[in-house]
Amino acid sequence: MSLIKKLPDIVANKISAGEVVQRPASAVKELLENAIDAGADEITLAIKAAGKTLIQVIDNGCGLSEEDATLCFERFATSKISDVGDLENLHTLGFRGEALASIASVSQVELKTKRYDDRTGTLVKISGGRFEEVSRTETPNGTAFSIRNLFYNVPARRKFLKTNATEYKHIFETVQAQTLVYPDIKWRFYSDDEEIFSFLNNNLSERLDYFFGKDFSQNLIEFTEENDFMKLRGYLGKPAMMKRTKNQQFLFINNRVTQSKLLSSAIMTAYGELLGEREYPFFLIYMDIAPHYIDVNVHPTKMEVKFDDERNIYNMVHSVVKHRIKTLDFSPNVQVEEKPDSPRPTGESFNFPGVAKRLSYNDRDADMRSSNALFRDYKTYYKAQDERAEPGFFANPKREMDWRSSLPAHTEASLTPPKQAEPEGNPTFHDGSRQMEIFIQSRDDEPATAGQERFVWQLHNTYILTQIKSGLLIIDQHVAHERILYERAIAVMESNVPNSQQLLFPHSAKLSAWEFDVLKEIKTDLVQLGFSLRILDQRTVLVEGIPPDVMPGREERILHEMLEQYQDYQQNLKLEQRDNVAKSYACRSSIMAGQKLSRNEMTSLIDQLFATSMPYVCPHGRPIIIKLSIEELDKMFGRS
């Protein structure tokens, strides 16, 4: 008896669905592409529960006959190609005939369709790959395709779906890309019975401004280039529009939403030194190329392509982009609103000295002992240097100090905010002409000493070098501050005592639809962190208060970046929600590499770093401190 058996179609389709339909957004993509291939110029998408309970696409395309309405659910049934040679002259988005069979096998499907010349339409109902009804029905011209309860019969697959906010973001990005590549189509998008957007005219600028912010399109550089076998057109972002993620990069090849490492590399290389560390440019590029020069049949989702002549394709894209960014004015267009400046926070009510909540670190006690020893090395060295300093060079009065009060605490301390300090006592971080309130406490019993001022340096406005008894410490200022803010955020949220700096002039922030969903998901933690937020409508939130670590005037930017960072961490790191919020906040609110600090700011940063429970690594695991001992330095210089 043979051990190898041919799988029934219904089983094969369920297995195939795991590759073709990875999440609700995959099903949305397939239905939208079918509507586009049908010649529709009006498409409506409606979802519920981020596509988990309902995905519905309605179009005014050519419709299907009764025979085709049932045949389209058969595996490898397609109207797009008839033999393999047709792939070299492909002008449609779909061609394999796999998607509908896969979708129908893992959901409950209802299809209503009618051709223009037919008197009545066709109704098809399928559940788990089995036909339940095929009948004639009254329906408008075009097609209405509904998918309910995706993966209802594949529990193992359904449990791996992400939160509604995450799945919604993927759907939003899918339909967003289609609206940009097909501006001539009228698009409507509804989520849980609320209209998200409605684009009823052929205006690409309107869509760009909706998705990315007011007047966004005015800061783009338009270009068009053409040669014998390819045409390039599109828009490039100015350096002032750089992002920390790649979610504002769009590449459309023959009107197909595509990802290409080759072309992305060509564009990034063309920007060259205009890009900072971990910065990505906006681009929206349309490539029209003869189908036989590309292969779109290389990935289950058809998101990747291969080129027949990669070198020439790369060189042309790189050359076009580089030429445009070298010859045009890249200064951003800025519109200034005349309104009173927001007040600057004063005092230190946001500091919580001595707080050391139990965080999930391995061997924490050993790390704390090591941290204490290194901190004692740093402090005792400066105390000894100060005692040996010649009198008269620094006129600061000397007082007896208790260095132990600066060591990391091992017990949970009170979260009562400390007494307000005089405003002039607050050190500040300088960022060009702007000043940010420092987040680091300067205790009255620990003034800067002569030794401290002499032995703290900033290297390339990125690293802090400080001399200790046993050698040299090198500290990354960004991740050091990130560690401080992370532990402070965790402590504040766990204390249930929000510490908010109220704004004299509240600021309204416009959110994208997915940002608004993320905001609703984490709003409680944001309030605990110190944000005072009032929702005005489904796209607008009023920021009335901010954590004291956020400079007034940057609240909207920080909020946008936090929501983006939170979503990125949620997808890639699978963090617990409160931990994710704290890490996103710390990452986006901390001082950056390249920011100049004063000596007082640097010594204060070091003091607070050593007051954390884990001063050696940032919340993401990057090293904060590198120590070079005298012995290691001696070896480098060949000293015996």
UniProtKB/Swiss-Prot annotation:
Keywords: DNA damage, DNA repair. It comes from the Bacteria. Residues 332-353, 408-431 are annotated as: Disordered. It holds the Pfam family DNA_mis_repair. One of its GO terms (cellular component) is mismatch repair complex. GO terms for biological process: mismatch repair. GO terms for molecular function: ATP binding; ATP hydrolysis activity; ATP-dependent DNA damage sensor activity; mismatched DNA binding. This protein is involved in the repair of mismatches in DNA. It is required for dam-dependent methyl-directed DNA mismatch repair. May act as a 'molecular matchmaker', a protein that promotes the formation of a stable complex between two or more DNA-binding proteins in an ATP-dependent manner without itself being part of a final effector complex. Belongs to the DNA mismatch repair MutL/HexB family. HAMAP family: DNA_mis_repair. This is DNA mismatch repair protein MutL. The lineage of its organism: Bacteria, Pseudomonadati, Chlorobiota, Chlorobiia, Chlorobiales. The gene is mutL.
